[in-house]
Amino acid sequence: MTNSLYQKHIISIPELSRQELELIVETAGKIKKEPQPDLLKNKIVASCFFEASTRTRLSFETAIQRLGGSVIGFDTAGNTSLAQKGETLADSVQIITSYADAYVMRHPQEGAARLASEFSNGTPVINAGDGANQHPTQTLLDLYTIYETQGRLDNLNVAFVGDLKYGRTVHSLTQALAKFEGIKFFFIAPEVLAMPDYICEELDELGIEYQLVESMDDAIPELDILYMTRVQKERFDESEYAHIKSAYILSAENLQPARENLKVLHPLPRVDEIDTDVDATPHAYYFQQAENGVYARQALLALVLNETL
């Protein structure tokens, strides 16, 4: 298969084809089975996180080092020239990309990754999250996890639960799965946190089936994947938050009618939307999902920085 990802900016999921997504998933599986310690030998990757991150930053840096690459960068913008001296993001990107073979960036501003790609002098930019916009590498690890647990990416029933309005992970994953055949979505959220209209309109245009469901219990018996998200407390007053939160807590009891193959995923961190009693069920897969972030990011970096593998 031709590697069309070589030297490509990874900014958003809609810009990746089904074939490219499958190539990343396939490569992640190979690397998980057979580690490749030299694929980034003599490569330098800039890891620049302008806002806090634990799993994404550490899994990227682990991925780089396990492939034999070197990491430069920062985990907070507070001590950079950008913050201390008023340097523009464009200037910062131009300088840092001159030092590195790839530029991994998380930024609170929507569109920051695309801006970076315009000033990177051809150095590939990988979006590690830009505000509430896109988080493509989370989607890649989600796709790999779904494939690992289900053996396919076609013909799946997938539910998203919780904050579907602001949750960039569910937006990106919906757009990715929409590239495959026979997908049916269940969107389970309070009206104030419903899936954005533009996502539903995209699905309508593609003729993809989806249902707006009020209760998890109504959907669970049909599901292959149950993707939980955190309802963000800061968006509600106390009484409203307490009501909404209680309606979207998953317990082991909820999973009793589930299919044997159902897996529960979560981008983490969880607060209390998944009871700890779920952890001991065969359906829980969110910790393995987080671990898969390393393999998915290894695959992406290897493909972006190597014309052939």
UniProtKB/Swiss-Prot annotation:
Q: Per UniProt, where does L-aspartate bind?
A: 85, 168, 230
According to the UniProt entry, what is the EC number of this protein?
A: 2.1.3.2
- Pfam families xrefs: OTCace (PF00185), OTCace_N (PF02729)
InterPro entries in the record: Asp/Orn_carbamoyltranf_P-bd, Asp/Orn_carbamoylTrfase, Asp/Orn_carbamoylTrfase_sf, Asp_carbamoyltransf, Asp_carbamoyltransf_Asp/Orn-bd
GO CC, any one term: cytosol
Q: Which PROSITE patterns match?
A: CARBAMOYLTRANSFERASE
Which keywords has UniProt assigned to this entry?
Answer: Pyrimidine biosynthesis, Transferase
Q: Is the keyword Cytoplasm in the record?
A: no
Pathway assignment reads:
Pyrimidine metabolism; UMP biosynthesis via de novo pathway; (S)-dihydroorotate from bicarbonate: step 2/3
GO annotation terms (biological process): 'de novo' pyrimidine nucleobase biosynthetic process; 'de novo' UMP biosynthetic process; amino acid metabolic process
Catalyzed chemical reaction(s): carbamoyl phosphate + L-aspartate = N-carbamoyl-L-aspartate + phosphate + H(+)
Residues binding carbamoyl phosphate are 55-56, 106, 135, 138, 268-269
- A single GO molecular function, which one? aspartate carbamoyltransferase activity
Q: What does the protein in this record do? A: Catalyzes the condensation of carbamoyl phosphate and aspartate to form carbamoyl aspartate and inorganic phosphate, the committed step in the de novo pyrimidine nucleotide biosynthesis pathway.
Similarity remark: Belongs to the aspartate/ornithine carbamoyltransferase superfamily. ATCase family.
Tell me the subunit arrangement.
Heterododecamer (2C3:3R2) of six catalytic PyrB chains organized as two trimers (C3), and six regulatory PyrI chains organized as three dimers (R2).
PANTHER family this protein is in?
ASPARTATE CARBAMOYLTRANSFERASE (PTHR45753:SF6), ORNITHINE CARBAMOYLTRANSFERASE, MITOCHONDRIAL (PTHR45753)
Please identify the protein, giving its name as recorded: Aspartate carbamoyltransferase catalytic subunit
